[in-house]
Amino acid sequence: PLAIDKYLGRISGPLLDRIDLHIEVPPVPYEDLAGSAEGTSSAALRRLVEVARTVQARRFGPGAGLLNGRMTPRQIRQYCRLDSHGQAVLKHAVETLGLSARAHDRILRVARTIADLQEAEPIRAEHVAEAIAYRALDRRLWTR
């Protein structure tokens, strides 16, 4: 843990701001690897992604080829509408974690995608909370 913290301390905030997802993945216990438990099938995941891409194609227009991850700051403000609870969660995270404008926009892009997977409009608090959870290094560096 100390070596990890030392290494992470060498990564600049502006570099982390350019990475959409920071996820810590714990080791998988051998029992889980050797067991017969099945997760979500690739076919089911593919259907979810196809739904989200269809939602995005409707949003941006046919033939635009634009995906949420490529939205400009202007498009983020246009298409990433949050309900009041979502606004409150995002505001609290920005103030508590000291997030930059770039991190704020990346959270909105990811939250928009999470909402699209559920065909939800507007973006709700749970979508924002999940997107914030994917910013593990922001939280880890801020709470050191």
Where are these regions (language model features)?
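Basic, amphipathic alpha-helical bundle interface domains used for macromolecular binding and assembly
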Residues: 1-144
